[in-house]
From Swiss-Prot:
Predominant location: cytoplasm
Any one annotated GO CC term: BLOC-1 complex
Gene (name only): bloc1s2
Protein name (record): Biogenesis of lysosome-related organelles complex 1 subunit 2
Species whose genome carries this gene: Nematostella vectensis (Starlet sea anemone)
Record carries keyword Lipoprotein: no
Family: Belongs to the BLOC1S2 family.
Chain coiled-coil ranges: 135-155
Subunit structure: Component of the biogenesis of lysosome-related organelles complex 1 (BLOC-1).
Amino acid sequence: MADEESSSSSLLSKDLKLPPKTARDIGSVDIKEDEDPFGEISTDARARQRLVSEGSTTAEAEEKDLKETCRVAFDKITQYLNGELTASLEDYTLLEQLNNLTTDKYKEMSTMTKSLITTMEKLDDKYKSLQPYLEQIDRIEDSVSSLEQAAYRLDAYSKKLENKFKRLERR
């Protein structure tokens, strides 16, 4: 009996040019069938017409559902890809902004460094121009310190002489 249903279902699908699933789905339609010796099914015209209209409606509905599902899937894939591309674009825009800020910062630092180099060169030139005066100050300082030493020695010697003179005077 199951073999008869599967063969009748496949024969219906061949006669109606419907996929086997559709023929099985509409197999619940009440149709009077007579088998001929070759295993083909014969039906009356009205039942066959009802089967065709229900089968085509089901096939059309399945095709419509499939198209709608595909459209929704493509829309969601499009949204996903647009989101990914937008995120990548925003990442690259952020990187570009960071690169521009870094470039500006390095330009600013380069300008500051050049300014510092110029200032240091000027200070070095001033130091070189003051060098003879600094050497003269060092020589004067040495002279002052040797004069101070001489003054201390003279003071000590004068105190000695004063003490000797006082001793001689007392005698």
